[in-house]
């Protein structure tokens, strides 16, 4: 049984090092885990527990390509969500893994979750229907993941959980995808002997977000959180995407991933995200395709006038972004795996430039007074230097965009100064590619 004494004495330090990479994080993480255990006990009483972790993600390349069956280069990051969990036995929930027998009682068949200081949510295993009044709520995600497990023929079960997160909400590190992955990982390990694949958990999470949470999204966020590390994903077959973990470490080249929160939030940007997908799909529809994958730049240029008249300028810009970005991902992977860090950085910078000019997901046209991402990129470029020189690194928007976080790949010896510069307007997290969602 994991206890506060075991954690404080260093009994899980090796696991924590695997999860968080940076040994300077050990003391903080020990305290964090102990606090989570104590909070769980306050809520649900003494007893044996599981602990689970699911990381946030950073998109390295492939901005808004996943929903068009494109390619993505992404990494899970060492900012995560952890859950202290105890299974609750009922007729529907029979554990196949571990020494925990769970407990029966009035809450059998009910998932109970407290997240940090938020009120408890409760989800019945027998009530997993979509409810539009629950859109954009945590309860909707839990219901969606539970329903997804049932639809795929996996077992589901009730549990009590206390969850605490270091993944900033609404900041672009995919807190919702990390949460979906966490719930899926709990159901997999407690009720399916840990045999539900990371890919299945990701697909279930995407379904939960699209159908139950009411937010259109591709599969990149969930796949990166669930599979972990640095990963190349090709969504050409969205039912069975190609997923390759890359044996690459940016740190070996003397660079760090830096995630900067520009303080804006993704919470009110659903329409902006939906517009990108709808406009890309409109251009694809012109060619009698559902998505842009397979459509070439020549196709766009040969039909430029009619596309412009039918759909307007921005649709063309966004379609061209997808076509070029999709090719760029493949080139980024090749540059990384061959050790050509200069070419990789050039491509990352080019990706950010395309997102700014063509994809146009740096700020919302509904709120032009607030442009935190634009300011973050400006400050980064001033410090990092001319993008053609890469004096200290490169930067780009990542993820959904419009608000939240930016990504910078910064020389290790420049990270502290970059932090000091960015902390004037933002909050910077130094990160590394982390492990997949797992039981601790």
Describe every region a protein language model picked out:
Residues 71-89, 227:
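Structural signature of FAD isoalloxazine-binding scaffolds in flavoprotein oxidoreductases
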Residues 193-242, 351, 377-383, 387, ...:
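Alpha/beta catalytic cores of group-transfer enzymes, especially the acyltransferase/condensing modules
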Residues 429-440:
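Single conserved hydrophobic/aromatic residue that forms the stacking wall/gate
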Residues 152-159, 187-201, 412-425:
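Phosphate-handling active-site elements
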Residues 76-79, 173-193, 407-410:
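DPxDG-like acidic metal-binding loop motif
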Residues 146-169:
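Glycine- and acidic-rich phosphate- and metal-coordinating loops
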Residues 1-57, 82, 86, 90, ...:
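C-terminal nucleotide
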Residues 54-58, 62-69, 166-181, 391-409:
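Glycine/serine-rich anion-binding loops at beta->alpha junctions
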């Amino acid at each position: 049984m994991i206890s506060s004494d075991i954690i404080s004495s260093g009994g899980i330090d090796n696991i924590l090092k695997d999860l968080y990479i940076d040994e300077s994080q050990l003391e903080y993480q020990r305290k964090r885990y102990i606090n989570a255990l104590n909070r769980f006990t306050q809520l649900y009483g003494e007893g044996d527990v599981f602990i689970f972790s699911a990381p946030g993600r950073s998109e390295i390349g492939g901005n808004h390509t996943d929903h068009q069956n494109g390619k993505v280069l992404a990494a899970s990051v060492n900012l995560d969500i952890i859950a202290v969990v105890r299974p609750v036995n009922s007729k529907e929930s029979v554990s196949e893994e571990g020494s925990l027998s769970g407990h029966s009682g009035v809450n059998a068949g009910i998932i109970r979750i407290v997240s940090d200081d938020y009120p408890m949510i409760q989800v019945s295993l027998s009530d997993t229907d979509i409810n539009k009044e629950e859109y954009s709520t945590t309860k909707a995600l839990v219901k969606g993941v539970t329903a997804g497990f049932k639809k795929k023929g996996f077992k589901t079960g009730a549990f009590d959980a206390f969850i605490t997160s270091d993944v900033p909400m609404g900041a672009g590190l995919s807190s919702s995808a990390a949460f979906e992955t966490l719930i899926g990982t709990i159901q997999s390990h407690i009720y399916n002997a840990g045999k539900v694949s990371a890919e299945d958990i990701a697909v279930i999470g995407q379904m939960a977000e699209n159908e139950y949470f009411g937010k259109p999204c591709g599969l990149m966020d969930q796949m990166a959180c669930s599979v972990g590390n640095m990963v190349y994903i090709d969504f050409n077959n969205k039912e069975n995407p190609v997923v390759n973990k890359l044996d690459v470490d940016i740190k070996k080249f003397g660079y760090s991933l830096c995630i900067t929160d520009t303080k804006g939030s993704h919470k009110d940007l659903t329409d902006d995200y939906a517009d990108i997908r709808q406009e890309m799909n409109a251009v694809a529809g012109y060619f009698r395709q559902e998505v842009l994958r397979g459509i070439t730049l020549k196709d766009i240029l040969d039909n430029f006038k009619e596309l412009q008249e039918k759909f307007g300028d921005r649709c063309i810009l966004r379609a061209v972004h997808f076509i070029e970005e999709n090719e760029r991902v493949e080139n980024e992977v090749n540059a990384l795996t061959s050790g050509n860090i200069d070419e990789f950085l050039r491509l990352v910078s080019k990706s950010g430039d395309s997102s700014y000019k063509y994809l146009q997901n740096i700020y919302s046209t509904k709120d032009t007074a607030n442009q935190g991402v634009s300011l973050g990129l400006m400050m980064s470029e001033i410090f990092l230097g001319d993008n053609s020189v890469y004096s200290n690194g490169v930067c780009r928007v990542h993820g959904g965009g419009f608000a939240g976080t930016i990504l910078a790949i910064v020389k290790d010896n420049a990270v502290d100064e970059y932090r000091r510069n960015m902390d004037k307007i933002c909050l910077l997290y130094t990160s590394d590619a982390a492990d997949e969602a797992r039981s601790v």
